Amino acid sequence: MVFFLVMSALSNAGKSHGGTIRTVVILYMFSTVLAAVIAVFASMIFPVEMVLQEAADTAASAPQGIVEVLSTLLMNVVANPVSALVNAKYIGILSWAVLLGVAFRGAKDTTKAALTDISEAISKVVTTIINLAPFGILGLVYTSVTTSGLETFTTYGKLLVLLVGCMLGIYFITNPLLVYWCIRKNPYPLIFKCLKQSAITAFFTRSSAANIPVNMKICEEMGLDKDTYSVTIPLGATINMDGAAITITVMTMATVQTLGIPVDIPTAIILSLLAALAACGASGVAGGSLLLIPMACSLFGISDTVSMQVVAVGFIIGVIQDSVETALNSSSDLLLSASAEFRQWRLQGKEIKF
């Protein structure tokens, strides 16, 4: 799933269609990386630990510094692609998906369509499996409560507060800075317009794709160039994944802190970049950001047995987490698309109205 989602997303990203679209893509990628970086440092400042089974063995074999992390990363990047798929070496899968995705950008439209169809088919299979998640969640909650008592729910609450806090911080603090850089005026009227007209709808639909028509209608009402937003809004639903980057990073950091694995600044930066890149493949399936957590955990030598427990914890808090994540992702598509075009207006001396 990771392989085809990321490869399809990058191959269909296409080439720049002008200065505005180039600016939008830069804003998308920068905001996603920034979200991951902020999530890492927020997790360091407000550490949260979870209750995980079979954690001791993983902690004993985990890397103890940046040298071991880089060694693991390098060996996984150059892993045989077939071996990476068979043995679930997520970093190797991601590296090959990126290389092939970029290579396929010059392929025929029929080839790109085939990649999209395959990724959608795999997504449907995974979605069917996810629909059975409540049964697994029931078992996980039962095991956690019988092992650790009702205080388990306090841990889940702290984790949820950290996730939502990071997402709100991105939307109300860092995104306004990006908007101000574009328009050189008070960004909050535009921030709240996108919040009211786009984020609320996305919160309840929990689907960036379903919110595309809403965002395009708002762009039309603001008088934006249709040739631009008809490209940037659907593209944003694929690669602008601030919320997904936060989810992957926070959940991975919580796992690392639970296992007592040390994380220095260089390792944190690598995790941020990896999470931002992985987030590009999170749009193809409901709860996609949670399913990419094992890939980030593999950077620290954490086994699938442990990382999939973390995914299960994510599904427990997923109703709120996924809703807020989608609201951030989709409203940011609108916000950054509009900001990039308003920047062009400002440079041309046109009046900016929103």
Region roles according to the model:
Residues 1-5:
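Active-site-adjacent helical/loop segments in soluble small-molecule enzymes
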Residues 9-19, 105-110, 148, 184-187, ...:
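Juxtamembrane helix-boundary/capping and inter-helix hinge elements in multi-pass membrane proteins
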Residues 19-189, 350-354:
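Signature of multi-pass transmembrane helix bundles
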Residues 29-33, 37, 164-169, 202-207, ...:
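Hydrophobic transmembrane alpha-helical segments of multi-pass transport and channel proteins
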Residues 51, 250-354:
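Transmembrane alpha-helical segments and their short flanking loops
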Residues 88-92, 126-131, 165-166, 183-192, ...:
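Membrane-interfacial loop-to-helix junctions in multi-pass transporters
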Residues 197-279, 336, 347-350, 354:
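Helix-loop-helix junctions within the multi-pass membrane cores of secondary transporters/permeases
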